[in-house]
From Swiss-Prot, chains A, B:
It holds the Pfam family OMPdecase. Belongs to the OMP decarboxylase family. Type 1 subfamily. This is Orotidine 5'-phosphate decarboxylase. Catalyzes the decarboxylation of orotidine 5'-monophosphate (OMP) to uridine 5'-monophosphate (UMP). It comes from the Archaea. Gene3D superfamilies: Aldolase class I. One of its GO terms (molecular function) is orotidine-5'-phosphate decarboxylase activity. CDD domains: OMP_decarboxylase_like. Coiled coil: none annotated. SMART domains: OMPdecase. It comes from Aeropyrum pernix (strain ATCC 700893 / DSM 11879 / JCM 9820 / NBRC 100138 / K1). The keyword Lyase applies. One of its GO terms (biological process) is 'de novo' pyrimidine nucleobase biosynthetic process.
Amino acid sequence: MDPPAVGEAVKRVIVALDPARRGDVDRLLDMARLVCGVGAGIKVGLPMLALGGSEALAEAARLCKGGGLRVLDLKLADIGYIMRLAAESLSRGFDAAIAHAFVGYEGGLVELKKTLDGLGARLVLVVSMSHPGSREVLDPCLDKLLAVARRVEPWGVVAPATRPEVVARVRETLPTTVILSPGVGAQGGKPGDAICLGGADYEIVGRMVAGSPDPVSALRGVAEYIAARCPEKLLHSSTGNGPS
Amino acid sequence: MDPPAVGEAVKRVIVALDPARRGDVDRLLDMARLVCGVGAGIKVGLPMLALGGSEALAEAARLCKGGGLRVLDLKLADIGYIMRLAAESLSRGFDAAIAHAFVGYEGGLVELKKTLDGLGARLVLVVSMSHPGSREVLDPCLDKLLAVARRVEPWGVVAPATRPEVVARVRETLPTTVILSPGVGAQGGKPGDAICLGGADYEIVGRMVAGSPDPVSALRGVAEYIAARCPEKLLHSSTGNGPS
């Protein structure tokens, strides 16, 4: 039996399943079955679509049904008409779909939100990214991105575990919006950086778990690391908008 | 035989082939064969991938080989690692691939450019979009987006035919970079708005041609409209970076 904080922490870790080659697709789909019952859920996107087709996306969503959040991460960033077509054909079976806030509301995200609402899927908007290039345009324009997020009212936003100060600023601006934070592990963020330091609800881990020979142990290891850093925060999630 | 300006204009019109449902995929692939020898080329993206799989993307590129520009438009907007995976698995056979300038250089576009260079494909960066939402974040941050474009040095950039003044500003800032302008037709831009008023090299037309029962005639109609507006500009392309 996990100590309470570890049990709570593991439910805050989403595993990103991004195949690097066709041979990875089946291995990562098998992994979905393993990690789904343990962690917060899974995230699949363009690499899975490119290498495994829409069938692999649908299979990932099916395997994780009832086992946590199923996040479709195509980083949608086109005009409303095109994002709508993509959402209609790909987001069935997913709990949430990720798009970019910088696309803007008019003729863009307003159409996507309507489509996702109709499919019972939640919208997550990227307001900052985990790689260094995010400092060049996204971060200087964060105020405008947060203004779009306030207008669109997504269920969640993405802010980077690699820069917890950005997560903290997003949390301050959007106190009741769920924050998902990629960038833990291969990209340099340490488990707990976003949840403990920034106030995020979820951390997204990719290669650190998906590249492990024993993904469930690796996932537990991430959770233990987070739990050791901020047990009180995990047990008394201040935002009240923890995973539902 | 087309009058010279019409002959030149038709070589400046790229047809976007975006299926709205699975049944459209084959029809649009057949259309690729028709329009490729006539216009400047084709653009396919997420709807074709979602509804026809990577096989449909590859088929579109194959059908248009030697018949003009083949542009892959996934609006890539992720960290470098993910964009690299997508480019490696999908951009073979394409002449150019579109990504978003706002992703930034470090850990983002620098990796994508290297991958595309290795595949012999050219990078096109979106610096502004054709829908009204582009006024909310992208346009106010255009200076920063153009700075990223100057650093990345893509073969081309995307700027909207729906706002020719933005095209003109991009042309002024990036005098030798090819400008591709979507937004003609269904989105409200008139043929020639980007080329004649803004100095773009190509206009991208989607449903106006792809939705026509006679796409080649519709394509010629667009070209005649452009040619009537600025014959001299077409015949003496000032930027010298006309389609090559």
